[in-house]
């Protein structure tokens, strides 16, 4: 949504912790396949922690039940779709897609907002070997933490971004964290995006309690990510990236010491098989696959969640801070994008089955045609030649694929409605209604309606009280 940035000041404004703002910010940074979700309870992450099994075409087409087990191994032949078993009756669509849409690898990072009080410790950073390509910037200007929290996630993941954003990382590659912070704060492109979320001010006279309220409400955004098999808290007020559970993460796992070589070979073989046979979603999963390995058996989301809970407990138990408001936002792959990929897979299956029926002499017309050349890894989807020759079986596949498409389209509609509501909320938050309000009041006064309206409202309020 375009907004007026002509009078943007050099300072950075305060930003509300709101999914509609972060989603819009990501889109303007070029992260078109990324979205955010509000986390109302730490149990929200349970499904994502449990669903680590790599998704393959058998899961999407209802041949195998997706169990979500991290340690489940698949032989190469098991990845080949059994066309006779397409869309099994015993697999619940709702349960299937609830798991497939909450896959572990879809979460890129977690943003935590909290009120900084006297409890805040700015010495959490303990010196360690920080990876050279880990992007961390110190916050050198007030109120920039919201944008820095987003950048701390997207610049450390394989996410497509605008050239302006990618150039920031390239330009500041050899800078220390303070210089990286200066680079961010002096980037006009970023500052204009950030400051466009400043609500319009309708009255010049500030509230008499403004300064007091401002001093009391000091909130801060930080990010949690996994990077090279480690979990990091990226907080711009710290001296460096904080390694979470550093002692635990650096402990050697005795179960792995004896068989590292064999395990590595097995993992490589499994990875090669999976890479050849998984669909496009799996490729995206593997791009972020520093998620659950090398942390002494603990999952990075689980480690982050435990650390956030510990932070919340410390703040709640602190007698110096009476404001215990928090907010958690998960930055993840956009469900709308994932659902559309699944819809396209089922549309291709349906189209191929219909072509097979035509080849067998059935009098049907192709509808909902899809250009298969636009989609990668089509070899994972059963070819026309490999489909069964039984007409009844083929019609059954068509009917079930239609049900899958209809169900997914209902999920897609829900996601689109969420985005519409966010867009509407953004409009109301940042549209300047002042000229409209003043024009309305002037017209009411001109036609001698203002005084009567005022008296009616005054009488109404007096009656209520």
From Swiss-Prot:
Keyword Cell division in record: no
Sequence segments annotated as region (Disordered): 244-293
Site (Transition state stabilizer): 139
Cystine crosslinks: none
Impact upon substituting residue 145 to S: Complete loss of deubiquitinating and deneddylating activities
UniProt note: domains: The Asn-rich domain is dispensable for deubiquitinating and deneddylating activities.
Protein name listed in UniProt: Ubiquitin carboxyl-terminal hydrolase UCH54
Gene that encodes the chain: UCH54
